[in-house]
Amino acid sequence: MKDLLNLFNQQRQTLDFDAIKIGLASPALIRSWSFGEVKKPETINYRTFKPERDGLFCAAIFGPIKDYECLCGKYKRMKHRGVVCEKCGTEVTLAKVRRERMGCIELASPVAHIWFLKSLPSRIGLMLDMTLRDIERVLYFEAYVVTEPGLTPLERRQLLTEEQYLQARQEHADDFDASMGAEAVYELLRMIDLQSEMARLREEIVVTGSETKLKRLTKRIKLIEAFIESGNRPEWMILTVLPVLPPDLRPLVPLDGGRFATSDLNDLYRRVINRNNRLCRLLELSAPDIIVRNEKRMLQESVDALLDNGRRGRAITGTNKRPLKSLADMIKGKQGRFRQNLLGKRVDYSARSVIIVGPNLRLHQCGLPKKMALELFKPFVFAKLQRRGLATTIKGAKKLVEREEAEVWDILEEVISEHPVVLNRAPTLHRQGIQAFEPVLIEGKAIQLHPLVCTAFNADFDGDQMAVHVPLSLEAQLEARALMMSTNNILSPANGEPIIVPSQDVVLGLYYMSRALENKKGEGMVFANTSELKRAYDNSVVELHAKVKVRITEIETDDQGLRNKASSIVDTTVGRALLSEILPEGLPFVLVNTEMTKKNISRLINSSYRMLGLKETVVFADKLMYTGYAYATRAGVSICIDDMLIPIEKKEILGEAEQEVLEIQEQYQSGLVTAGERYNKVVDIWSRTNERIAKAMMDTIGTERVVNADGEIVDQKSMNSLYIMADSGARGSPQQIRQLAAMRGLMVRPDGSIIETPIKANFREGLSVQEYFNSTHGARKGLADTALKTANSGYLTRRLVDVTQDLCVVQLDCGTAGGLTMTPIVEGGDVVEPLKDRVLGRVVAEDVLLPGNDDEPIVTRSTLLDEQWVAKLEEAGVQSVKVRSPITCESPFGVCALCYGRDLARGHLVNMGEAVGVIAAQSIGEPGTQLTMRTFHIGGTALSAAAIDNITVKTSGSVKFTNLKYVEHANGTLVAVSRSGEISVLDTHGRERERYKLPYGATINVKDMAEVKSGQILANWDPHNHPIVSEVAGFVRFIDFVDGVTVIEKTDDLTGLSSREIADLKRRGSQGKDLRPLVRIVDKKGNDLTIPGTDLSAQYLLPPRSIVNLQDGAPVGIGDVVAKIPQEASKTRDITGGLPRVADLFEARRPKDPAILAERSGVISFGKDTKGKQRLIIKDADGSEHEELIPKYRQIIVFEGEHVTKGETIVDGEPSPQDILRLLGIEPLAAYLVKEIQDVYRLQGVKINDKHIEVITRQMLRKVEIVDQGNSKFLNGEQVERQRVIDENAKLIARNELPAKYNPVLLGITKASLATESFISAASFQETTRVLTEAAVRGTRDNLRGLKENVIVGRLIPAGTGQTYHSQRRYSSVGLTESEMETLVGRSTSSGTEVTSPSKDAIPLGG
């Protein structure tokens, strides 16, 4: 019996494997796969349609065409299983063996495998140490190669032309062997003794001096090492036997009309077989050499085309002029095996239809058309019909269903109750694009969708379609209900804020009912409770917007957790009091006693989730929605053209602007301003004007004059329909209303530059023909941009997912002490993101102490910061917190829960097995479509208008200096003499409120820790000149000042004062080229003074174009300006914005002119310049010097004698992330990447949590570069996975040997994806050929650790609920007990770790 059951399993290969290994196939292995040799190119007999014997479809080789039936029909049925027919040679078995039985072709002459020859770097070339060009000349019969020199002066692997060969034959007769073609290469490869070659190279690498040779040797050592370790032989890269793919994988299908559709592979195989057979015949006939050679070359070319068509020479085309699809093309690209069939499969039990709005559904429901449900749940319905006895057979049940009998519908109702379905809207950019709902049967053919989940799906009802899938197994249903149900996805995983927020109509309704208006019916009435008020409202005694007093009863929770009722009389409006009726118990009335704009509603739902948990919030969100719709209907808001009020001031503002433009035009004509300045100023004037008119318009629309209850005339917010919509956040924005009622403003040309004549009209007035034409320009560009943007954004998401796909939470605590220090983010003096927002949901890395009290920790190490904790931190005035980060996590694979912190979508500590990598990739990729594509062009004045020349405080408090070096001027002010100094303002609690950068040479009007008032000016400076400040008091002495050569004297006509300007280098002529004009400060006797704290003389090198106003010998005091350098309006640097910028950062691309950072700390001096470069020298503390050559056109921002620290900017520009990592380390790099990426997203108003960017940065830092190999087997300069080096070093240290030293390397996301340990994942991403070639040579083993690899081999992913399956599978093979397994999977927490976290409604995931 057991064998009978085994019958079905014989064909199934085992699924229980732990790894997949790839390698080179030896000829013996290929022959062992084969079931016979394919000798003829024929496919099938066109009369009988039966396969030809020994042909490409031969039944004797590949198996029978029909199950259990031989080709000639002698043996049929199961009883002859396994018999080989003596007449036709077919084995009687299942026909599906034709999918797995391979054949082979014995090649008459060896052939090189094109992947190992042409895929760069050429493996055959490296192995033989010959160039690819030379090998190709041998292979394609253009030259001889010496395979065995014997005793002749010839070298092995030396190439000989035909003449040289004949000459050598004459000279040396048969003393040497030389041949051509793949045989020659095969011989050379066969002779290589890998071990001795390896030893020779290891010796050579020690003595070699040349850089290029070293690189070549390193590559060869790696390759030979790979061959030795994997057990591959070099000659296997040359094929002597060619495997033939099973016929069912390259089918030949008869079409009607007697023609055949065939796979391209059959054509390619036919070509190879034809040429091979012809070559055999020629060799038998011992034909002339030239003919044989030609045939061999053609055979090589046809095998090349079969393996990878088009890689060498022109691609072989079929009858229809398109290139044939070779074996390589089958697996690579979007249509290849990996991406088309293994990573994206089509599934059954699915349907799709248009979606319509379902405003009366509950949040967990969706409306499913009856017809669709019946089709989807058919098998369930059949089973139930049979169980009920309404049908006896499946056939009978089928008939009932087809006739759509009445009882079928009742049964369908029962079947679908409590059976969730999964809805999906393409494009699925993040995990909220697929959610589970309980179906409700509806009439019609459209799917009803709950309005609150539209944001998550990014769906609207203008014809969008959605797909429905049915989870069949019990496990799938359970997961759909527990994890994917729409009620479990209230918070966005990107930022932890509610994603189930009302929008549009609902917001409008709630806003309308919560507005307060003056002098409405019933104003000033007092009500005992809300039900009394409701009665009054229903009887039209009070109006909805009247201001009234109501007694509200609330439930309050005190410190002990006891719940008490508290009632109070509140000033409110009728609408808000009615709104309080749906407020769940435990939420304060304050939350709704305000205008319910979209922001406030979001805050309300967030508070509800944090205070009351999931279930209450879901019910509340539904009630909010129903209320919103009801009152939107009552409001009856509509817009008409009269709602667009054009401000009266428009005419006069336009007049002023036109006047200004005329003035500038005149200045330009008289030559006072350049064309560029004129353009910039004009654009500036118009954008300012536009803003003024827009403000006037918003004031006009947004306020109205009314008489209040006391008879006075007052202004109140108007109820203008347009204004209501924009103000509530329901639809539209001030920008759009501006175009309707103020002026359209400036338009953009397709290249992104601004047209200087604005559109003065608005849409209500109507545009003139010319204005309309101008506006079409930019509009078309916008549409083209959108299309490109979607593609680019999708590609970015794909790369991000690929680099992070194997990152999961693998343990609770890795025990690291490292982390990142978080501080508030400040821009232009304002705090953009306070500290509490940055550390919320993070785990503290070390105790946080009270500022000014080092004994008392507020928060202890390893605490998860929730809302209560961050409030405490803010109260205490903490300015920086060190938190755990994925970047510093020390888990070998994946990250640990404490380094990751809170799961943003659930609000508690992240669960074991959560796929945090994919979530990070989706959170960053999904808003990609909202980012802009264009680079911003910023002209001169657009910037110079905003040239800041002082610091004015916005809040009162005390001043704190950070990193600030300053000297005290004689008049009592301080002068800044450092570049990276900052001034901050702290409030009474010591919390930082503002922070400003101070430029060099700024005058500071306050002392450190001084009290300041709001509006006070702390510091000021000249924005147009960069001063050089003297740090000592003494007398000026000019050095190398030669009039007319290095300096030009200028006298001002008005004042008569003279000043000297340092001449440009080009103008100095030959005698001035070695002069270095500088100002030295000396004492009375003329001795050099030194800068305090150093032994450098106080001298200041003057760069070209700097201006000196002092005379030689004049006295200077501390803090006086010695010279100043005019700053031209900063060069227009295009700011790359939007998507391209994000992509550049993640790809870790070096900017075009990167900032030059100081390689070490020390004091600056300048050396002798070369032709196009200036020489900058940094002298460090122990006197060693480091030189840096800097192009003349770059502006150096440091001066002689200035002290710089390692990694400080010395030449302005965009810093390169690689430099930051090398000079400053991982933490500053992380801070830089997070800041730069967040800046782009913040500009678009997109919120993404920092930890997602950190997760991706972690993956970019996976590799390290070996700087000193120690006793390890790594080579210097090799890039290796960090974890491999750590493991290897641990072994070395255990044996008391020298460990390898290494530096972290930053790889871009594409590079990092391709450099992953898993070759299956890398091959399915990009450059499939290269990845597989490399992996085969190394004999790589893929341990199937990531998500992609497991999807490809058809298993559950090792994340989420699939992690338990994997751990059980692993340990069942080891045979552990239950308790041991629990310990391993990570139930236990590491010692000394406490995790404090409120886990409300937590759904524990496997683990």
Curated annotation (Swiss-Prot):
- Annotated residues that bind Zn(2+) 1 are located at 70, 72, 85, 88
Xref: CDD domains: RNAP_beta'_C, RNAP_beta'_N
Residues the entry annotates as binding Zn(2+) 2: 814, 889, 896, 899
Alphabetical list of Pfam families matching this protein: RNA_pol_Rpb1_1, RNA_pol_Rpb1_2, RNA_pol_Rpb1_3, RNA_pol_Rpb1_4, RNA_pol_Rpb1_5
> Gene Ontology terms, cellular component aspect?
DNA-directed RNA polymerase complex
Which pairs of Cys residues are joined through disulfide bonds in the record? none
The function of this protein is:
DNA-dependent RNA polymerase catalyzes the transcription of DNA into RNA using the four ribonucleoside triphosphates as substrates.
Name of the protein in its database record: DNA-directed RNA polymerase subunit beta'
